[in-house]
């Protein structure tokens, strides 16, 4: 089944949102490291005004618009992401990081029960297909430094400043 997409202009550039008939499947930044914009994928169709996928995308657009307007701090959307069981554990943990705060990759690994899994947590974080909504931008280095982000470090910095997250940048 082809995915349906829509475009959303935001302060961090035009996002492309993708959905199946039941859930949001992706959020892509203009500078996404995950390949070409999804609108170039074979079989993907732009959202119309009705249908199950269009309804998911309308909800996602509205909630992201509210996030950028600072009137929403959490998201309530059905999500569908392909990944391993471990990646899903990491992505679920990311959703528990409160708006306006950050955590480190090491702290997230420890929270998941394996303090030695820092690198694996970082890899799973980087594979998150639904950034912002699954807030991978809230994960920073051990000393508070900004580290990799699919939308670019400038976008990560903007999102954290937008949320009022106080971070100490490492030397």
Q: Predicted regions span which residues?
A:
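Basic nucleic-acid-binding alpha-helical/helix-turn surface characteristic of O6-alkylguanine DNA
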Residues: 1-116, 162, 166-171
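Active-site and channel-lining beta-strand-loop segments
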Residues: 15, 139-141
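Helix-turn-helix DNA-binding helix
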Residues: 118-121
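Terminal helix-turn-helix DNA-binding modules in bacterial transcription factors
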Residues: 126-131
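Short Lys/Arg-enriched helix C-cap and helix-to-coil transition segments
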Residues: 132-139
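…primarily DNA-binding HTH/wHTH and HhH modules…
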Residues: 142-171
